[in-house]
Amino acid sequence: MNEPLVRAALQQAGLSGDIHLESFGVTGNNHVLLGRAGDRAFLIKQYFQHPDDPRDRFETERTFYAFLSDAGIRSIPKPIAWYPEGRLAVLEFVQGEKPRAATPGLVQEAMDFFLEINRQRENPGAKSLPLASEACFSVAEHLATVEHRIQRLGRIAPESPRHEAAINFVRARLSPAWIHLRERIERLSAQASSLDVNQRCISPSDFGFHNTIRHTDGRLRFFDFEYAGWDDPAKTICDFFCQPAVPVPNDWLPSVLEKVSREIGGDDVAGRVALLLPVYQTKWCCIMLNDFLPSGSQRRLFSNPGLDDSRRQKEQLEKAMASHEKAFP
């Protein structure tokens, strides 16, 4: 991370003098430093960008944090400063631990956060929020999003035995299973219509316990809103149950759907989730294989310069294969 840019961002945040900076360790998409000034701790986050992935993560997250703050939602790290020149954010450092396993209480807390956000849908600030990354408002759009990911994986270059193993998995298992699933969903949804505006939700996107910290006060703090915006609530729920880092048992899906459908999207949400859940199980298998694509590999190295790329690729392939076998035995 460029130190003059970091110092400029910290100065804008009113932080100067004796500041200690250190790597924050393993992160997903971005380069993060932990800073300390006296008894004050904070994070400096630099956002990844790549020609193959031009999404403006910095501006999306800044806009969403502003929306949450204006709405009085406090279960988030407090933003301290934004520095567009270096695509840097300075955020409150939340003391606590990542949840190691989902519990009914944590799931309820996460859904309370999601619903609290969506009670602000009629606020003026909500109208200016962008569409979420890969937003989908019809079954066809959900299918097209995953189809695009499958097609990208079909272009993995055979540059190592690990890559060849990934290619074999995509060709022999992932792609054939997807073709069968896609055709079945297309038949089942032939008469489905697109979502009305009032059926859409404000989605944190990439929503799950992998993007939370349990604060020392016992409550969750939610973060990482780089893909947030308007979306289909069924997609938000499917992602929540499909993300692999802190799995949420499908047994809890009915209670979540009952809670959410009372406030967002109505009874149609449950039907779309039932239809689309295997689509999103496939999507998350694709996401696990992003490390075999140039933009995915470079994003990981950007966030963690010391990363052992070969070891991670091996682990990600094993996870993708296991997840796919569990979902599609």
For each feature predicted by the language model, list its residue ranges.
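Juxta-kinase regulatory segment immediately upstream of eukaryotic protein kinase catalytic domains
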Residues: 1-21
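Short Pro/Gly-enriched beta-strand edge/turn motifs at strand-loop
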Residues: 12-19, 60-62, 185-196
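Active-site acidic catalytic loop and adjacent metal/ATP-binding pocket
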Residues: 25-44, 183-236
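ATP-binding pocket architecture of kinase catalytic cores
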Residues: 29-148
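A cross-family kinase active-site recognition segment
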Residues: 98-180, 193-200, 230, 300-318
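Active-site activation/catalytic loop segments of kinase-like enzymes and analogous catalytic loops
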Residues: 233-267, 278-299
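ATP/Mg2+ or Mg2+-diphosphate-binding catalytic cores
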Residues: 286-329
